[in-house]
Each structure stands twice: as C-alpha cells, then as structure tokens.
C-alpha cells in the first residue's frame, strides 16, 4: 500500500482503493494529486510563517485603536490567548484586524473592508456562558484559515464596564454584541447575529450535532449560510451554493445528510438526531434546494450479469437443503378447490379410497426417507450411521403399529390412527388379549336403601 493512503481517512481510503481495484493505473494519478495538495499546503504554511515574521516588527498605537477585546481565546488561525484589535493601519490608513501578544502583532488581516467576506456570532452548544465569533476572509486572493474566537460573556461584560462602555448595572451580553457590530460597520464589514431574537422572529436559525468522517462537530443552519465546525477544516457554504441534498443511513435514532454543491462536490454529515429532521427539511424547502434522496443514481443498482444477488443466493441455498419446497407448500386456503376435502381428512372423516391413497403416500414417504437415510450413511461418520439405524428401527416399529391398526380397521384414516368405529374396539382388544372379565352385580333400584353413585356395585 502506498504511503499516502495511510494518511487518508478510512472512508476516503476505501473509496480510493475501490477505484484502484477497477482501474489499477489510477493509483499513480491519486499519488500525483496527493503530492500536489501537500506541496500547496506546505507553501501556505511557509507563507503564513513569513507573514507572521514580518508582523513581529509592527505595533499598533493606542490612538489608532478603534476597538479591542483583551485576552480572548483564539482557536484559529492561531491557537492561544491574544488581544484582538480593530485598528487603522498607519501605512495606508485602511482598517485592519490585529492579533497581539504583549504589544507585539502576531497576525494581521489587512483591508478588512474587502477581505472579510462573512462574519457572525454563534452559540457555543455545550456552554451558555460562551459564544463564538467566526470570520471568513480572503488573503492574497485565496481563502485563509477562518478566524474563530471564543468569548466569555462575563469577561467581556467586565471589560466593557471598565471602559465605561456599559453601565455598572448592565448584565445583558446582547448589549456587548450590539456595540461590536456597530464598530464593525464603522470599519467596513458586518457581523451578523442570526440567533438574536429579532432575527429568529423572521428566520429560524438552528444547529445540530453531527460527524464529518471521524470528526465530531456542529452544523449551523443560518439564514444565508451553513457552517460546520469547529475542528479543522471548518467548512462554510453559502445557501445559494447548495444544489441538492440527500438523506441516507436513516435509522430509528439518526440519519445522514449529504450536501451537494453546484460544482458537484459532496459533503456528508452523519449521526444526526432524528428529532432534527423536520427542521432541516423545512430549511431545505425554504431555500428551494432539491432533495435527491430518491434520485435514480442513489437507487439500488440491478446486479450485473454473472453476479448473484443476496436474495438469489438465499433461494439457491434453500433449494439445495430442500427447505424451499416446504416453505412453498400449499396452504388450506378457502379459494383452494381441495379446501373442503383436505379439511375433512384432517379430522379423520374422509372416504376409504382417499385413506388408502394417503396410506400409500405415507408408505412412499417412509420409503423415500429410508432411501435418503441409506444415501446419507455413505457420507456420515460412524456415529451418524448408528443414529440413522436407530431412526430406521423406530420407523419400522411405527410402521408395524400402523399395519396392526390398519388390519383391524381397513377404512381408518392414516392421519388419525384411532379414528375407528366404536364397535370394532372390543374385537381389537380381545384379539390382543387385553380384555378381562370383571364380575359385577347390578343393584336393585327398587330396594329401600339409600344409594349413591351409578347403580353398579363391584365385587
């Protein structure tokens, strides 16, 4: 196995190997694609390191600061506690976002009016006291790692009060959000707040827990965007980019969703709670996204010639074992012409001719079973031969008993060996020495003695 396959996720590796099994020469193409992507990634890392190095010498004067958040947890593009500033670049007087540590600039986004494409506040699913600030932007003409900041509501409220941006009695974090949004507008970009009451009244934003491959994350459904986060890579989709959606792997508890973009890319998100289906389906319908769950390409494919389906394989196995004939036996259905006749036989009241035919059939079946047993003796080991012989002896004894009963009553139904006339029973018992004389005396019912019972007294 080529080394690059080991670095792919399990699901992606299986897909690649499936294609390679059909087209062995394609492995070299996959290798080239992997190398190209790796070289591009290494180049991006080198560029980022160079840019971070060049910003180490920069500093932001206090008079150029428009707004700042001190000691907040930055998760991307860096991962550390930093002070985030919206300031004016001294070189060209354009607004910028600066990430500082001890008054040194570690990362900067220049000309935020053009570079910031989308920014929003998002709820932190596990903790109500935290909120995300997410920002998607371009750098040097390409999408860079998005900005993701975790804001502690109590900490931010405290900072705002210390700067006299809020009154001492204010405790609503929404006041901080509104202030930050106004400052962003002043510098040329907007921060949306889709989960605020005013927006929720007109558009229902929501989020669901899910998996992207082996990575657990959250899928946010916003008015004009869908975001998956927040483990890298963070994915952002514009609603208008989504061409279709499919639902799959539907179980009693969970289901999968696959987003298909207009350029044909597919992004599958799995293990979504069934309770969220109605919200997702309503969102899809409002955005007029096509549901391709029942499209021809997703339907079960017809087996190719030479291939045996699971159903036909099962059928073949049943035929070999003889089980299929038993399963397909005739039922005593009312529409069946033989319904009444078979029903009569079941209680032993059939005609004599039918009984004889059934008896012959019984004998034939016994003979067939004995023949099958004889054939099986050649294939079975010694233990199985002994068991077969015992079964044959039992069958012979049963057959002898049936013959005795049949001789006693030729018209008896084989399906019920004891369905004979009442007056024939004594003859049969006497023939086998089973009748003994029991002396009895009949009591005179005309005597005056009080008696109980049947009126028969035994000596």
Curated annotation (Swiss-Prot):
Residues 401-418 have a biased composition (Polar residues). GO terms for molecular function: DNA binding; histone binding; nucleosome binding. Gene3D superfamilies: 2.30.29.120, Pleckstrin-homology domain (PH domain)/Phosphotyrosine-binding domain (PTB), RTT106-like. Residues 289-300 have a biased composition (Basic and acidic residues). SMART domains: Rtt106 (SM01287). GO terms for cellular component: chromosome; nucleus. Its main location: nucleus. Residues 289-459 are annotated as: Disordered. The keyword Transcription applies. It is found in: Nucleus; Chromosome. Disulfide bonds: none annotated. Keywords: Chaperone, Chromosome, DNA-binding, Nucleus, Transcription, Transcription regulation. Residues 330-345, 352-398, 421-430, 442-459 have a biased composition (Acidic residues). It comes from the Eukaryota. InterPro entries: PH-like_dom_sf (IPR011993), RTT106/SPT16-like_middle_dom (IPR013719), RTT106/SSRP1_HistChap/FACT (IPR050454), Rtt106_N (IPR040993), Rtt106_N_sf (IPR044891), Rtt106_PH (IPR040770). The keyword Transcription applies. Histones H3 and H4 chaperone involved in the nucleosome formation and heterochromatin silencing. Required for the deposition of H3K56ac-carrying H3-H4 complex onto newly-replicated DNA. Plays a role in the transcriptional regulation of the cell-cycle dependent histone genes by creating a repressive structure at the core histone gene promoter. Interacts with histones H3 and H4. Belongs to the RTT106 family. This is Histone chaperone RTT106. It comes from Kluyveromyces lactis (strain ATCC 8585 / CBS 2359 / DSM 70799 / NBRC 1267 / NRRL Y-1140 / WM37).
